[in-house]
Regions:
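Core catalytic lobe of class I
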Residues: 1-193
């Protein structure tokens, strides 16, 4: 169901995007389960999404790994690979935590409205740029999401990978001009709005 919608959406995003502008999406690798998939491991959801965009003509522009605390993930998910007892039993079944990714795609062509950080109220100083340019963002607050207090009951809608507001703020600062319209077709719980 997801891929049917997504494969329809990606060409439409390409159609409405200005040349030279960027589209970012937040995702993670998906853990598999013995009950559902027959094995314990990971699915390269990130790679599948990138390939879907590239098939339409998007350029894989950049990506950032967003560090996540494996202890928090272990406490929340009880994933076998993150449990300390697994190291003692058989460390070949242990694994690292799963980070989030911010993947950025670019539509080919020249950007008709460059995004310039000239210091006129929209400056990005060198120290900030050095943090933003890092391939791993370690300073994103994992609890800073709109979902922080929601989705506590079994029948509540849960997101695979809740988007931290700091990631949105950083992407908007880097890649948009004041007054730009930002399209968020899935909108989730409205974090971008």
């Amino acid at each position: 169901e997801f891929y049917a919608q997504f494969r329809y959406l990606v060409p439409e995003l390409y159609r409405v995007m200005k040349p030279g502008r960027l589209l970012s999406f937040h995702c993670m690798l998906l853990p598999t389960s013995k009950a559902r998939d027959g094995y314990i491991g990971l699915t390269d959801f990130r790679g599948e999404l990138i390939r879907t965009f590239r098939e339409v003509g998007w350029i894989h522009h950049s990506e950032v790994v967003i560090w996540k605390d494996p202890v928090t993930a272990m406490q929340r998910t009880k994933a076998l690979g993150l449990l300390h007892k697994q190291i003692r039993k058989d460390s070949c079944m242990s694994r690292q935590g799963i980070p989030d990714y911010l993947i950025t795609m670019r539509k080919p062509g020249d950007n008709p409205e460059p995004v310039s950080h000239t210091g006129e109220g929209d400056d990005i100083p060198v120290s900030m740029w050095q943090r933003f340019a890092s391939p791993v963002w370690t300073d994103i607050d994992q609890g800073d999401t709109l979902q922080r207090q929601s989705a506590r009951e079994d029948d509540d809608e849960k997101h695979i990978c809740p988007l931290q507001l700091g990631v949105i703020r950083r992407a908007m600062k880097l890649w948009t001009n004041p007054g730009d319209v930002v399209l968020s077709p899935f909108a989730g719980i409205g974090s971008e709005g």
